[in-house]
Structure formats: C-alpha cells, structure tokens
Amino acid sequence: MGPPGNARITSDSIADRFFKELSSTPSRIKTLLAEYRIPRERMADRLRENYQIRDANVLEAMRRIPRHFFVSEALRGRAYGDHALPISFNQTISQPFIVARMTELLGLDKNSRILEIGAGSGYQTAVLSYLAGQVYAIERIGELAREAQARIRELGIYNATVKAFDGTLGWSAHGPYDGILVAAGGPRIPDPLIAQLKVGGRLVIPIGETRESQKLVRVIKCESAHKIEEHGPCQFVPLIGQHGWPEGSRQ
C-alpha cells in the first residue's frame, strides 16, 4: 500500500525502509538485502577509490539500493562487479560506475523533480528516487516498464513512477524538470527534452554518430546558449524513438 493522499516518501524514509525498519520489509526482500550488503558496500568503496565518485549522497545511494534485485537470479552473483549486465528484450542494466557518474552529474537534492529515459529494469530509477523528491521514468518496452514499476514498489519506493512510451518525447505533463537522465545513446539531443528542462537544469545523455558508441554529455540549460560538456566515452543501447534512432536501423 502506498502513502496516504499526496504524501511524498523522502530519501531519509526510503533509507529507513531499506535498513532501519527491516521488520516491516517482506522476508524475501530482507534476505536479499542482508545477503548482498557487503558486496554492495565494497562496490561503493571502489566507486570512490577507483572511479573518483565524490558525491557522498550518490555513494550512499549506491550502498543502499540492491542492484541484484534488478537482474535475473542467475546473474545476482555478478551484480556488484563493475560491468553492465543483460536484462530482458536485449537491453542492459548499466555498470555501477556509469549509474553513479550520471547521477552525480545531475547534482540532485531532495526537492529535485527528475525525468529518466530508458528505465530498463528500474535500478537507475531506484537510485534516483533515493536522492530526489520525485522521479518520472519512461521505458519504451511495456513489459520492462511494468516489471520496473513492480520492483520499486516492492522495495517500498513511492516517489517514482514508470510509464511505457516514446522517451524521446519526454513527459511534459510533469515538467519542467530539474534534471533529465537518458540511459540510451542517441544521435542528437532530443529537442523535447531541452524544452522540458528548467533553466539551470541539467540533462545527462550519451550522444554518438553511431548506435554502438557515444560520448557522455551534460547540458546545462541557460536563458540563451546552453552549456554543453563532454564527460568521456561510453556505450549504451540505442535511444529509439521519434527524436532518436529509427527502430531497426544500423546507422
């Protein structure tokens, strides 16, 4: 059951749900959390020491959110290595470093309203929900969207909503957004996403001339010319949609 009325679950109370009040957590989830807590803490330590993730709140989110819950049971033993893992429908869950870096680049706080494109199995959505006030996530594959929504609800997260449609169009009904994170690589920055970003807001997106490789880009929206930064090479599944790659194209 969700919170009454329009009450919002804060990041602190999500943390409480994960660890401080485990007596109210279903026994299956309680077991999963306890079993993988040490690998999760080691992963966060590597992110700080080897990958220079500096935001303490992002590192805490990576410690708290159970990545293994968002992959198949057969892959849970690999969930805390720094690599992407396959999920259904030829999609992937991003490597922890990329999740942490993209989240850090958004500069979130508890009042942030965030749009996520490419929710996949819901892991990045859960990380964002730990740090932000409200997260609206889009996943173009309907079954993945439904599964992601079910997972985050099962973990007691009520400040995130996942919907299935074309993410390159954004979700204007809940904008403008303080931050937008795109977890798929596109040929260009979709105009609707810029339009739905607040002035001063940040958009983090992989952009590349081919579907196979990209550069991680951060756009900071300004009144006139926007500030665009590059943050290194990356490789994501293609961003499919009206303002992305055509479905089935190779270029």
Residues covered by each model-derived region:
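Class I SAM-dependent transferase core
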Residues: 2, 9-115, 123-127, 131, ...
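Conserved nucleotide-cofactor-binding alpha/beta core module
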Residues: 107-227
